Design a protein with these regions (language model features):
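Gly/Ala-rich beta-loop-alpha elbow adjacent to hydrolase catalytic centers
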Residues: 63-68, 72
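Flexible "cap/lid" loop of the alpha/beta hydrolase fold
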Residues: 80-110, 138
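Conserved alpha/beta-hydrolase catalytic His-Asp/Glu region
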Residues: 114-156
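Acidic beta-to-alpha connecting loop that harbors the catalytic carboxylate
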Residues: 198-201, 225-227
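Catalytic histidine-centered segment of alpha/beta-hydrolase-like enzymes
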Residues: 223-241
Length: 258
């Protein structure tokens, strides 16, 4: 995992952003959370995370997006954290609470530079949003991105006790192994808030709702009118909300919730 400082001014607080698959810092480096250092994490070919950088901060606030919603609770310790999820699940592959298995397998097996561009187009709400995204699109090597998706699948299936046959089909473990996985899943660090988009075309809305059902009441799950990649929502989550008085923050949550 890469950890890149965007702002490092020895502030007492850190905003730690876990980006999605195929991302880097390019689309997110324009944001400036008030009174905080700001670090972006990406490239989940490994989930190794240098926790020593957290020791200098009084408070660490975590925003996780897309595949980062799965990676963040694995990487970070439980202390001093406020965790916010956006358009992702802690079960990255799953027919009921993640990206449907066939969709994930088809994306991986058919991945080309052209299909990657189609994926990025699907992340965006409309053609104008996609055009704006192209100006700040990640600058990573395609082969590295493909390897990242392969290793995400490998890591997740190993964690869950799933084997993959020669045709790419998932073979699930026996009941004892599944029970062990479920128990481990529920020991994840719980998110404090989750924002999910009605126009998300990567993670199905109902799957995200199911994923967060066990964590908290409905007032902590915000269903917003946004796409998978949504620049106004990122501006709120990575910048504006951190300078809001609490009453304004809660009022804005009510406005966002559809």
């Amino acid at each position: 995992m890469k950890q890149v400082y965007i702002i490092k001014k020895n502030n007492p607080k850190l905003l730690l952003f876990f980006a999605g698959w195929a991302a880097d810092e390019t689309p997110f480096k324009q944001y400036c959370p008030q009174g905080m250092d700001y670090m972006i994490c990406y490239d989940y070919r490994t989930l190794d995370f240098d926790t020593s950088i957290l020791e200098q901060y009084r408070q660490v606030n975590v925003v996780a997006w897309s595949m980062g919603v799965w990676a963040a609770p694995i990487a970070v310790p439980k202390e001093k954290l406020l965790l916010i999820a956006f358009n992702g699940t802690i079960t990255p592959i799953g027919d009921t609470d993640g990206i449907p298995e066939k969709t994930f397998r088809d994306t991986l097996s058919g991945l080309t530079p052209a299909s990657l561009q189609k994926f990025m187009r699907r992340m965006c709400k409309d053609s104008n949003a996609y055009k704006a995204f192209l100006a700040i699109t990640p600058r990573r090597d395609f082969n590295e991105i493909k390897e990242e998706l392969e290793l995400i699948e490998k890591k997740y299936t190993q964690m869950r006790g799933i084997t993959i046959d020669e045709n790419g089909n998932y073979i699930y473990s026996n009941d004892d192994e599944m029970d062990a996985y479920v128990n481990d899943k529920y020991q994840y660090i719980d998110y404090d808030y989750a924002f999910i988009g009605v126009n998300d075309r990567i993670f199905p809305l109902e799957n995200m709702k199911l994923n967060f059902d066990y964590m908290f009441d409905d007032d902590k799950l915000i269903v917003a009118d946004c796409a998978h990649y949504d620049e106004p929502m990122f501006r709120f989550l990575l910048q504006d909300m951190w300078s809001m008085p609490i009453d304004d923050f809660l009022s804005h949550l009510r406005e966002l919730d559809t």
